[in-house]
């Protein structure tokens, strides 16, 4: 493992860590020797995840000023932030025939504008010190349009594009950018799904995959492998073929 990418001894801030992938990732990072701060809205849930081993900093990701204050608090508690992981996310299936503008906006507010708030809160200081890692959990749903995921998929595709552009822009400042694209992971978000979820994995398995990828210095971490292959291949299909496939799925 390249020492540049080691997790042990790093100051890592996870945003969206009260349950699911974020909580499992926080636990895995502590086990690998990282110093971890965790954030989400509910302090009681964060305290349960932290179990006295992590710094708890509650924050509403939609509140820009609160995000800036949280970043200051994390630095005061841990020191310079070596890595931030934006894992906050919202998912609810849409009925496109009864278009819900508020539901779409909620996806944008948390999944995309929250990421904007996160990057704005930590990037200037990373540029100043000349190092840092920005990590965001997107989704394989951002690779192609999926019926019912008009809002969720759009925000995840935007995340993927944003991070790809940002990676090139900040590399000269000693900052690396990693995009994490999970398939189906057993969490509170997926528990309400009524459709088939192939290749489902547990949150702790996802956390190990993320940590392994980070320690290898990967720019993109996609898992599980069967879902990664399926969705990567799906990107190559002609629009007409994909549209026909989605019509069958949405029947």
Q: Would you name each region that the model predicts?
A:
Residues 95-108:
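Substrate-binding pocket helix/loop in short-chain dehydrogenase/reductase
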Residues 119, 155:
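Active-site helix of classical SDR
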């Amino acid at each position: 493992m390249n020492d540049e990418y080691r997790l042990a001894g790093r100051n890592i801030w996870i945003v969206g860590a009260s349950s699911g992938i974020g909580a499992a990732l926080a636990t895995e990072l502590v086990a690998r020797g990282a110093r971890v701060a965790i954030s989400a809205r509910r302090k009681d849930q964060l305290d349960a995840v932290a179990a006295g081993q992590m710094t708890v900093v509650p924050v509403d990701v939609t509140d820009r000023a609160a995000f800036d204050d949280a970043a200051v608090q994390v630095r005061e508690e841990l020191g310079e932030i070596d890595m931030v992981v934006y894992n906050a996310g919202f998912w609810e299936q849409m009925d496109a025939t009864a278009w819900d503008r508020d539901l779409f906006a909620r996806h944008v507010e948390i999944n995309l504008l929250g990421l904007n708030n996160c990057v704005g809160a930590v990037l200037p200081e990373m540029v100043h010190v000349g190092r840092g890692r920005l990590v965001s959990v997107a989704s394989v749903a951002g690779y192609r349009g999926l019926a019912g995921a008009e809002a969720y998929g759009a925000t995840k595709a935007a995340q993927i594009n944003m991070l790809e552009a940002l990676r090139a822009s900040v590399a000269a400042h000693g900052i690396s950018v990693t995009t994490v694209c999970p398939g189906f992971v057993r969490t509170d978000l997926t528990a309400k799904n009524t459709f088939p979820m192939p290749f489902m994995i547990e949150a702790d398995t996802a956390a190990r995959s993320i940590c392994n990828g980070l320690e290898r210095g990967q720019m993109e971490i996609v898992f599980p492998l069967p879902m990664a292959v399926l969705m990567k291949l799906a990107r190559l299909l002609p629009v007409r073929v994909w549209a026909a496939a989605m019509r069958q799925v949405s029947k």
